[in-house]
A protein has these predicted regions:
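Hydrophobic face of alpha-helices
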Residues: 9, 13, 147, 234, ...
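Extracytoplasmic/periplasmic proteins that interact with beta-lactams or build/remodel peptidoglycan
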Residues: 1-28, 49-52, 57-61, 325-329, ...
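Short amphipathic alpha-helical signal-transduction/dimerization elements
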Residues: 206, 245, 321-328, 332
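Amphipathic oligomerization regions
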Residues: 305, 309-326
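Generic non-transmembrane alpha-helical segments
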Residues: 15-19, 84, 149, 240, ...
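Beta-lactam-recognizing serine transpeptidase/beta-lactamase-like catalytic domain environment
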Residues: 4, 30-75, 80-306, 312, ...
């Protein structure tokens, strides 16, 4: 039997369709995974078509974008860089990183944050999405160490969900990385992923460090994951990812009443004819809930929002919030947060997030 839950599928599609219309986006996708079994519970794409009505068919509408389309993830990749830094033993969540004036000169290039933030702890680098802080950590690691965490998290390999034409993305051999490439890859540029790959990769933060195999078929029994991180690293990452959805983070709009949500925003300029387009964005959010013992992973991509807002925390996080809110209720997942949701402050611009 298929693992797709029809209630969650409809919920994901409804929220995605509304967000794509609201933000005048070119397209969008949502993936909902069972964080304990790796089962795909929902897989929605917009635009789409009804296979019973061939008159509106065109190949662009029929594509399962979440599985076959690739994008540069931007800041949704930062947790994997920070996890590699924690794994090295040289950093803890409280280690202070100097982000100076929000600029890190590297030869002819400069890594920039949108807003200068001064000294930040590792946890704050993640919460505020600092490119400079993330790049500094990445550059202190041997390239192979960063590559090992990315590769073992499933990047650069087909996820094998059981769908024809799945994309494997691009993760280059670390022997070929120049320092500037290692720096930009640390915050999700120069690497390409599918939304399914990204959703699956976040399973390492749900399972105490194991990467789950994903499937479109119901699983009769529990599956073994592949170890990627030490359990203490995975738990530390989950704690830090909760800061992202709290005031001071980039995604308070991902909050869900009664549940702790951990997650990360991404806002990446898109490549057009080999150059980054200043006004075309891939805006994303990946959320885990309840964060105390995750049951669901929801990944959202809004492609080329053009109605004014473009940060992942503005356009993708609210979709994840709505999908999680409905899905947790449908699945009767007990709340892990006693307090009612407080009024959400306006989303802060990420410190970094864009390049």
């Amino acid at each position: 039997a298929l693992s797709i839950d029809l209630k969650l599928q409809y919920l994901a599609y409804r929220e995605l369709r509304q967000a794509v219309a609201t933000h005048k986006a070119k397209a969008g996708s949502v993936v909902v995974l069972d964080a304990q079994s790796g089962e795909i519970l929902a897989l929605a794409n917009v635009p789409t078509y009804n296979p019973n009505n061939r008159s509106r068919y065109d190949p662009g509408r029929a594509r399962n974008r979440a599985l076959v389309d690739l994008f540069e993830p931007g800041s949704t990749l930062k947790p994997f860089t920070i996890a590699a830094a924690l794994e090295s033993g040289r950093y803890t969540p409280d280690t202070v990183i100097a982000t100076a004036g929000g600029a890190l000169p590297m030869g002819r290039h400069v890594i920039r944050d949108v807003h200068a933030a001064g000294d930040l702890t590792v946890a704050q680098v993640l919460q505020k999405s600092s490119n400079v802080g993330t790049a500094r950590m990445a550059l202190s690691l041997p390239p192979r160490d960063l590559w090992a965490v990315l590769s073992s998290s499933g990047f650069g390999a087909v996820p094998n969900a059981g769908f024809p034409g799945e994309a494997g993305g691009r993760l280059r051999d670390p022997k070929t990385w120049k320092p500037i490439e290692q720096a930009t890859m640390s915050y999700g540029h120069g690497i390409s992923v599918s939304l399914m790959q990204l959703a699956r990769a976040y399973s390492i933060f749900c399972t105490d460090g194991e990467l789950l195999p994903v499937t479109l078929l119901k699983r009769a029994e529990a599956v073994e994951g592949t170890p990627v991180l030490q359990p203490k690293t995975a738990r530390a990452m989950r704690d830090m990812l909760q800061l992202v959805t709290q005031p001071g983070g980039t995604a308070p709009k991902a909050q869900v009443a009664g549940y702790r949500v951990a997650g990360k925003t991404g806002t990446a300029h898109k490549l057009v004819n080999g150059a980054y387009a200043p006004d075309k964005y891939a805006s994303s959010f990946v959320g885990l809930a309840p964060a105390s013992a995750p049951r669901l992973i929801v990944a959202v991509l809004i492609d080329e929002p053009s109605a004014g807002q473009h940060y992942g925390g503005q356009v993708a996080a609210p979709v994840a919030s709505a999908v999680l809110s409905g899905a947790l209720r449908v699945l009767s997942v007990p709340p892990d947060l006693p307090v009612p949701r407080t009024p959400i402050p306006e989303v802060l611009d990420p410190v970094g997030e864009e390049v």
